[in-house]
Amino acid sequence: MKGGELLVLLLASSLCLSAAVAAQETCPADIGAKCTDAASDDWEGEFFPGIDKINYEGPTSKKPLSYKWYNAEEVILGKKMKDWFRFSVAFWHTFRGTGGDPFGAPTKNWPWEDGTNSLAMAKRRMKAHFEFMEKLGVERWCFHDRDIAPDGKTLAETNANLDEIVELAKQLQSETNIKPLWGTAQLFMHPRYMHGAATSPEVKVYAYAAAQVKKALEVTHYLGGENYVFWGGREGYQTLLNTDMKRELEHLANFLQAAVNHKKKIGFNGTLLIEPKPQEPTKHQYDWDVATTFSFLQKFGLTGEFKINVECNHATLSGHSCHHELETARINDILGNIDANTGDPQVGWDTDEFLTDISEATLIMSSVVKNDGLAPGGFNFYAKLRRESTDVEDLFIAHISGMDTMARGRRNVVKLIEDGSLDELVRKRYQSFDTEIGAMIEAGKGDFETLEKKALEWGEPTVPSGKQELAEMLFQSAL
């Protein structure tokens, strides 16, 4: 075959593939007149017919659409289970997730979707979202500004689009007693943010990002949001060869300070949260992990203004366990919220899977209990269905499984507390500091001269066993 003929054949094949991909993004054939090229928000009837409100049926239930461990009104250690968790549905993963990936077209053709990105479609999607939360029994939701409303041709038009959708959300909230756990601005998808938002080398981009966060803060406040999150997916660098790190970090700090100032100006009493992540999409993000972020806040005088939103999958990407990140945040009094998800240990990227590991859930809940809960934060399911999960009921099953897993972890923590053996093991491990000299050291009065005298007096120390295997046995006994 000649080169020219081969080129024509390849182009034809490419066009056919593009057509096939596009076809998968169009309106599903089985919903007929409800789906038109000109999007309409006049959907009739339920979005999830045949699915009733999800109820607690106990551990013996074999019914997929029921809670086995999560009993919202049950009181455990002085709080209702729903108040320990304050569960939230993530709008973007749940209602904007398409199943598409770099190697394939979208796989999820939800019945209410019509293939457009119109305001009418955004309204229909919002209504489906609230019906989903009502049936799930979840009282909070989280959103990015650009996920709930489409971009316009100008910033003013985009803000007007957002206002229109927010009014609908406000109405739906008043009808359901559901409100945002947190809101945020999407500062990573649009090409203008390819070099970052608050760390962009272009001042016009910095100003645009500031305008977007200003609006998102105001919208979150208007909807009664309890928190506002900053996730800097592109606040970092690809190479240091073209990067002035000092200047970018200072710009980021000034941006966050401006957000603090605006929060106070509009009377927003919610908590500002920073969500650490080491990389992806940027090669190296500035908020690598909890410790790095805390150091940044200390350096720029922002402690007391921000807390941390720990995402478990981000923790593992940074080389830590979720438990480590939670404890680092907790002991520094900056634990504000948890994005409950997990990653796949066999891959090196952010897979955002629903957490179903009972052991991991128990460790997470041990930190939450020691923190006396997360309010005004909570647990947001920053997780998405697998690409191959395409049934509408899978949306419910995934959230039920995630909520049951966390509830089971919470019940396991009660077992550990009531048994007391693990806590006693830890106490005994440090009991040598429960002495006069130990108390002096912990009070910061252990000078080297005094300690040297003691070392000469005591001679070679006898070091006891760490009892790690026993600790693991005691922990496993509660699972």
UniProtKB/Swiss-Prot annotation:
Entry-linked PROSITE patterns: XYLOSE_ISOMERASE
Q: What domain of life? A: Eukaryota
Q: Which reaction does it catalyse?
A: alpha-D-xylose = alpha-D-xylulofuranose
Q: Which GO terms describe its biological process?
A: D-xylose metabolic process
Protein's UniProt keywords contain Manganese = yes
Temperature impact on function = Optimum temperature is 60 degrees Celsius.
EC class, as a word, reads: isomerase
Q: What's the name of the protein?
A: Xylose isomerase
Query: Which InterPro entries did the record assign?
Result: Xyl_isomerase-like_sf, Xylose_isom_bac, Xylose_isomerase
HAMAP family in UniProt: Xylose_isom_A
What gene is this protein a product of?
A: XYLA
Q: How, per the record, is the cofactor bound? A: Binds 2 manganese ions per subunit.
Entry keyword set: Carbohydrate metabolism, Isomerase, Magnesium, Manganese, Metal-binding, Xylose metabolism
**Organism of provenance:** Hordeum vulgare
* One example GO MF annotation: metal ion binding
Cofactor(s) recorded in Swiss-Prot or TrEMBL? Mn(2+)
Q: Which residues bind Mn(2+) 2?
A: E311, H314, D350, D352
Q: Where does Mn(2+) 1 bind?
A: E275, E311, D339, Y382
Tell me the first and last residues of the signal peptide.
none
Q: How does it assemble?
A: Homodimer.
Q: What is its EC number?
A: 5.3.1.5
Q: What residues form the catalytic site here?
A: H144
User: What protein family is recorded?
Assistant: Belongs to the xylose isomerase family.
> What's known about how pH impacts activity here?
Optimum pH is 7.0-9.0.
